[in-house]
């Protein structure tokens, strides 16, 4: 596995391989890899000749009071995991490599990016869309892989690709979970033992949503209220977003029919946990790009 920090050097290497007819898959990450990331890598390895994994903690997607400075980092560990997994190239630029001058250009999807998680993290999704757009321009992959834990992010990136006619197929991969159902996340390392035990309320709330819908509940506002009440059983959990949306568009729904996504954004202690579940048939995340095959694994 070769490691790059230079945009020009990576481009030069990939251009030569593409001229040989090799197709390229990209897995964008912020590092501190876990089994969920490695599932993305495995999917990319199975479907592409060349796999590029990027590790970049993107300052544009962090608010001023968020955890940019303490976000977990261990590039040596990550590189060893990726090498063992058969990744061809690791792109690990510094901030100066990605943003040599202050950014004057921003990619924004105003409606989608200001809803749900975007409502409590202003500017977050503009930062995500901007860095992903730049990574797509640098690597120019045929396919790119994202985890469904970040469901809203997948919808936004697919919409960006469609609106801007970016020739990249966006593939979403099911969420990987611990044995008790908690979605794997690099930020789980922040949880104390007590908070980690409390965090199981998040996947349990998704189970409760599925049960309530299965029992015939169809009013979205009633479901949101019941799920908020359910989360309140755990004193360490503070719900910030409890929402039922159309699974394809993320538009609000009043009546539950077809496919909906139940989206949760819950603070446990000082750590924000993000999770979701799609309930219903015929799911298509964000439109035309190819979705994953499920939500849990």
Curated annotation (Swiss-Prot):
EC number(s) reported in the record: 6.3.2.1
Residues reported in the UniProt entry to bind beta-alanine: 61
GO biological process per UniProt: pantothenate biosynthetic process
Location in the cell: Cytoplasm
A Pfam family this chain is assigned to: Pantoate_ligase
Domain of life, source organism: Bacteria
Binding site for (R)-pantoate: 61, 153
Pathway(s) this gene product operates in, as recorded in its UniProt entry: Cofactor biosynthesis; (R)-pantothenate biosynthesis; (R)-pantothenate from (R)-pantoate and beta-alanine: step 1/1
Active site: 37 (proton donor)
InterPro entries: Cyt_trans-like, Pantoate_ligase, Pantoate_ligase_C, Rossmann-like_a/b/a_fold
Cited SUPFAM superfamilies: Nucleotidylyl transferase
Keyword line: ATP-binding, Cytoplasm, Ligase, Nucleotide-binding, Pantothenate biosynthesis, Plasmid
GO molecular function: ATP binding; pantoate-beta-alanine ligase activity
Subunit structure: Homodimer.
Other comments on record: The reaction proceeds by a bi uni uni bi ping pong mechanism.
UniProt function note: Catalyzes the condensation of pantoate with beta-alanine in an ATP-dependent reaction via a pantoyl-adenylate intermediate.
Official protein name in the record: Pantothenate synthetase
Species the sequence originates in: Rhizobium etli (strain ATCC 51251 / DSM 11541 / JCM 21823 / NBRC 15573 / CFN 42)
Organism taxonomic ancestry: Bacteria, Pseudomonadati, Pseudomonadota, Alphaproteobacteria, Hyphomicrobiales
Gene this protein is translated from: panC
């Amino acid at each position: 596995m070769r490691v790059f920090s230079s945009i020009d050097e990576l481009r030069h290497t990939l251009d030569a391989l593409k001229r040989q007819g090799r197709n390229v898959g990209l897995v964008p990450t912020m590092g501190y890899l876990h089994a969920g990331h490695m599932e993305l890598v495995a999917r990319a390895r199975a479907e592409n000749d060349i796999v590029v994994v990027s590790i970049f903690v993107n300052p544009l997607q962090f608010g001023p009071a968020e955890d940019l400075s303490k976000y977990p980092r261990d590039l040596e560990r990550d590189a060893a995991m990726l090498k063992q997994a058969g990744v061809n190239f690791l792109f690990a630029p510094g901030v100066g490599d990605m943003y040599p001058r202050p950014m004057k250009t921003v990619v924004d999807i105003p409606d989608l990016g200001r809803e749900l998680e975007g409502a409590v993290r202003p500017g977050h999704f503009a930062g995500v869309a901007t860095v992903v757009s730049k990574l797509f321009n640098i690597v120019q992959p045929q396919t790119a892989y994202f985890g469904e834990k970040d469901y809203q992010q997948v919808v936004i990136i697919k919409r960006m690709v469609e609106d801007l006619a970016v020739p990249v197929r966006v593939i979403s991969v099911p969420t990987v979970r611990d044995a008790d159902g908690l979605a794997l996340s690099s930020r789980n390392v922040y949880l104390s033992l007590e908070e980690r035990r409390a965090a199981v309320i998040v996947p349990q709330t998704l189970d409760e949503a599925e049960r309530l819908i299965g029992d015939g509940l169809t009013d979205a506002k009633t479901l949101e209220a019941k799920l908020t009440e359910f989360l309140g059983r755990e004193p360490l959990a503070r719900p910030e977003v409890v929402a039922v949306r159309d699974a394809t568009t993320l538009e609000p729904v009043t009546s539950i029919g077809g496919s909906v996504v139940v989206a949760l954004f819950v603070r446990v202690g000082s750590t924000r946990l993000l999770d979701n579940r799609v309930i219903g048939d015929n799911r298509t995340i964000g439109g035309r790009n190819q979705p994953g095959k499920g939500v849990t694994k």
